[in-house]
C-alpha cells in the first residue's frame, strides 16, 4: 500500500487533546460511559451506562495512535478497556453490557481482532472466536444483520460493522466462512440505488443518505469488492451530499457517517483522499471543544473516540484501516 499520510502538526495537536480527554474520562472498571439506547427519529434515547461499544472505539482510537495493551503512551488505558470488554463477553459469544446490541458487539469484536496480533493473551483469541461465531450465526436470510441476533430483517448500517469485524478477524487469523462474506456483499450490492448512486437503509427501497452510502462502500471494500459501478457512483454521491447534510448541529449520524466516509475515501486514495481528509480535518478542528472533546447525542466519549479515529485513519497503525 501507499505510505502513511504525513503528520500535520495541527491535526496531531487536536488528536493529542482528544486522547488526553479520553484518558481522563475512563472509569475505574476500564469502561467509558455513554448513552446506551437507540436512535429515535432525529434524536437518540437511552440511559447513560458503561458502554462496551464506546469502550472499544476509545481503545481503537488509542491504538490508531500506536498504543497497544501495556505499551505506548496509552497502553494502560487500552489494557483496562480490554479487561472490561473481556468481562462483558457472554457465554454464547455476545459481547454486551447493559443491553447494548449488535453495533456494540461488532465494535468490540473489531477491537479484539486488532488487539489479537499485539498480545499472547489466550483470552483474547477465545473471546474473538466466540464473537465471530455469534456474528456468523446472527446473519439472516437476506445476508445482512440488524440490531439484535436472530432478527429476520437487516440494514446496511449494522451490516457494515459486522463485515468490518469479520474482515479484521480474518486478517488476525480467525476462520471466517467465505459464504458469510459473499452473502453480505450480495446484500449490500442489492441495497445500492443505480438512480442516485446512494445506498438504501433497508430493502425494499427506503431512505438513502450520506452515512448509509459511506457504510455501504466501506462494507464492499472490506469484503474485497473494489471495482464496480456501485463504487464510483457511491463516491460521487458522497461528494454531492456532504455539503447539504453534513454541518452542525451534529446529528447522531455525523461521526458515524464520517468514520465510514473517510475509510471509503481512503480506499480510493490519491487526490480524492487528500482533499477529503483536508476537508473533514478542517471541520473537526472547528468542532473540537476547549477541553479536547467533541460532543453529540450519544455523549462526549463516543464523539471524541470517533473524531480522533477519523483524524488518525491515514496513519495506518491499525491493520483494518490499511489499503
List the predicted regions and their residue ranges:
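Predominantly the C-terminal beta-signal and adjacent terminal strand-loop region
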Residues: 285-289, 295
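Alpha-helical segment of the N-proximal tetratricopeptide repeat
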Residues: 21-25
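An alpha-helical repeat/solenoid feature that recognizes helix-turn-helix modules
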Residues: 1-20, 33-77, 90-133, 137-183, ...
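Acidic, divalent-cation-chelating loop motifs in proteins
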Residues: 26, 89, 192, 288
